[in-house]
Design a protein with these regions (language model features):
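A short beta-strand micro-motif
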Residues: 7-9, 357
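Extended, polar beta-sheet/loop recognition surfaces of beta-rich domains
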Residues: 388-417
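Flanking scaffold residues of small Cys/His-coordinated metal-binding clusters
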Residues: 3-4, 31
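Conserved recognition-core residues within compact binding domains
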Residues: 18-166, 175-302, 313-382, 386, ...
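Short cysteine-rich clusters marking metal-coordination/redox-active sites
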Residues: 9-12, 36
Length: 417
């Protein structure tokens, strides 16, 4: 019940019941504030949602580099493109499935390519089902898994500067049926709230506005600071947050990766790494840590490998790298410096005046005979090593991811390696 008293609000200039004004106590007396409760709420809301002045644009809108080896040749299918720039890329942790940058999914069934059927969850989020390679009770097996389309499109096509917090996805125009990668923005909870509020009020969700929100300190998580963005490792890598355990195995792996790519002294000793680089997402340690912990497995020592899944690859990224047992990784390593003037695995024996084929495994040398030409010696080395790699893959079958097993079974040694 009201008191029967009224007052005009200084903000909206409307006469309202005195009960709609907060009370302020001053010098032992009570006064009614001259701005009504509703207007005060709107003022606080506007201040909370307003962008800061002079925002430093440290994070820019970027898209992932797609390796051509991952792109499906659509001529192998009866499926047509919906737009000129549509591509389907292999999801390396799933069985026989390809994702489009427009959010369409192709599955391979009995040597036939078909478009996957979609459904919606209770929140209206588009999804489909696939079989994901999963480490369970000491072995890898394909388990039925849900693919949320927008989330997967972002994961495969869009650079996410902060995977730890950016778990919300803004669809341009608030249209959840639009999963084109250039219309999806990974945001944290507060950033998503700001973009949504601004769009509902103004109809504006331009990239310029969203990038400002992404960079505004007001809407960053508590662990973020400008200092955490400073590239302190090899002039490229930044920690992405406070409280990082610099003694952890994952941090050391991250540092080693950056040194391989950007340390001139390391390149002087290992010139084969001179053209290598780290993808945009992994320059942030927090992002690398999320991937590493999700893919770590088993008790055996694992190496971070960039070459097995895609031969000749020079980019360290979630889409091109895997963790492989050390003995497997050492078999695949290509060292031009160690090879010398002859093909890989071939040495000239001055005493016998012949070419010797030799395979080094685990610190031991396996002699494969002597030959009149380096080509003959290499042919023997090639056959033996390919068979050896396949035998090793069979020994590790179910103990290593399917993508790694498949790569090993199809690995070819070339004279140009």
């Amino acid at each position: 019940m009201g008191t029967g008293e009224y007052q005009v609000c200084d903000k909206c200039h409307k006469e309202k019941s005195i009960d709609e004004f907060d009370i302020l106590k001053y010098n032992g007396k009570q006064y009614h504030i001259h701005t009504c409760k509703k207007c005060r709420y709107e003022i606080r809301k506007a201040k909370k949602n307003a962008l800061s002045n002079n925002i430093d644009i440290l994070i820019k809108r970027k898209y992932k580099e797609i390796r051509p080896e991952r792109i499906l040749d659509l001529s192998l299918t009866d499926i047509e493109f919906i737009e000129y720039d549509e591509i389907f890329i292999k999801l390396i942790d799933y069985r026989d499935i390809w994702l489009s940058n427009y959010g369409r999914v192709i599955k391979k069934k009995d040597d036939t390519y078909v478009l996957a059927k979609f459904g919606y969850d209770s929140n209206g989020t588009l999804r489909c089902y696939a079989y994901k390679d999963t480490y369970v009770n000491g072995k890898w097996e394909y388990k039925k898994s849900t693919i949320y389309i927008a989330k997967m499109v972002v994961q495969e096509f869009v650079v996410n500067a902060d995977m730890r917090s950016n778990v919300f996805i803004w669809h341009k125009g608030m249209n959840k049926d639009d999963n084109y990668y250039k219309h999806l923005y990974p945001l944290n909870k507060e950033q998503y709230r700001i973009v949504k509020a601004h769009y509902m009020e103004t109809g504006d969700d331009s990239e310029e506005f969203i990038v400002k929100v992404m960079n505004d300190r007001k809407f960053k998580p508590d662990y973020w600071s400008k200092a955490s963005m400073k590239p302190i490792i090899a002039g490229k890598g930044y920690r992405g947050g406070v409280g990082v355990d610099v003694t952890s195995r994952v941090y050391k792996r991250w540092c080693d990766m950056l040194q391989r790519c950007y340390n001139a002294k390391f390149h002087a000793r290992n010139p084969q790494y001179m053209n290598c680089y780290v993808c945009e997402e992994w320059l942030n340690f927090q992002n690398f840590k999320i991937w590493y912990e999700a893919h770590d497995y088993g008790e055996e020592s694992q190496d971070l490998d960039k070459d097995i899944l895609i031969k000749g690859n020079v980019m360290y990224s979630p889409e091109t790298c895997c963790l492989a047992p050390h003995i497997i990784n050492t078999l695949i390593v290509n060292s031009a410096r160690a090879r010398g003037d002859y093909p890989l695995g071939v040495y000239f024996d001055n005493e016998k005046n012949k070419y010797r084929a030799n395979l080094a495994v685990g610190g031991k040398q396996i002699k494969l005979g002597y030959y009149d030409t380096p080509e003959e010696a290499f042919a023997r080395y090639k056959k033996y090593k390919e068979d050896f790699i396949q035998d090793l893959a069979e020994q590790y079958k179910e103990e290593i991811p399917h993508k790694l097993y498949d790569a090993l079974m199809n690995w070819k040694i070339e004279i140009t390696d």
